[in-house]
Design a protein with these regions (language model features):
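Basic, glycine/lysine-rich polyanion-binding surfaces/domains
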Residues: 3-177
Length: 177
């Protein structure tokens, strides 16, 4: 039985959507009702084409009133969203931020996260996110994952520090062997 697992999920893409129409635009992309989505909240969404066919199923993170990230497996959603926004006349900027994502999953992930960020990380609810710092590096941490266990995604905002973050988390997990 595994106790925790750290995965480099750099293959994941982040699509950043900002601008005055960002909230209206992300609602246009998915049939899921986002009207009550708060800043700091994450939602599992389905992106559909004009016929209702599923294009992708990312996690949507709301970082500000008009600031969103789509966190998805590799695909061309960035280009698709740019084309949809242009064609539909939305006032948004769509880009791919320089992010290095890691997943820390498993029953002991909470203890490891507390050793890294302190006890307040335990207050991060399922499918919520918050900006944090670790060793001078800016991260976005979400309580999401695929393991059916307690888990977190750590999205390092500057990919050049990815190896250092990975090693820091590995060291933090050693006492829990």
């Amino acid at each position: 039985m595994y106790k925790r697992q750290l995965c480099d999920v750099a293959v994941e893409r982040q699509v950043e959507i900002t601008g005055p129409d960002a909230a209206k635009f992300v609602q246009f992309l998915t049939p899921r009702d986002l009207s009550a989505m708060a800043v700091g909240q994450c939602k599992y969404v389905i992106l559909t084409n004009q016929h209702g066919g599923i294009l992708n199923d990312p996690v949507l993170l709301r970082l500000g009133a008009n600031h969103f990230w789509l966190s998805l497996a590799d695909s061309d959603v960035l280009f698709w969203a740019q084309g949809v926004a242009l064609n539909a006349g939305y006032d948004v900027t769509i880009s791919e931020p320089d992010v290095s994502p890691l997943q820390l999953q498993g029953p002991q992930s909470g203890k490891i996260m507390q050793s890294l960020f302190g006890s307040e990380i335990a207050d991060l609810n399922y499918y919520w996110c918050r900006p944090l710092q670790l060793d001078g590096s800016d991260l976005l941490v979400s309580r999401t994952g695929w393991s059916s266990e307690l888990g977190y995604e750590l999205l390092l905002r500057d990919s050049k520090d990815g190896n250092r973050l990975y090693e820091t988390i590995m060291q933090a997990g050693q006492p829990f062997d």
